[in-house]
């Protein structure tokens, strides 16, 4: 199925959840924030957040500094 990740069309397996997408994008263990269709998804909800055709996903990487 087709979704959008940070504005780019991305093909993913039907029924994938957010945890699967994070793994597919090799972001497991990274400090990120995720939004689906303009709704923030807490890290604790990644496994329950199933993606649907044409969902808009935004992934933001936390950058440390000082």
Question: Model-derived features: where do they sit?
Answer:
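Compact, glycine-rich, soluble single-domain proteins
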Residues: 2-4, 9-53, 58-61
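Short, charged beta-turn/beta-strand-edge "cap" motif at the junction between a beta-strand
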Residues: 63-66
């Amino acid at each position: 199925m087709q979704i959008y990740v940070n504005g780019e069309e991305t093909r993913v397996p039907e029924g994938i959840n957010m945890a699967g997408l994070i793994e597919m994008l090799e972001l497991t263990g990274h400090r990120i924030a995720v939004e689906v269709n303009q709704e923030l998804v807490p890290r604790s909800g990644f496994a329950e957040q199933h993606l649907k055709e044409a969902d808009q996903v935004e992934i933001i990487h936390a950058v440390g500094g000082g």
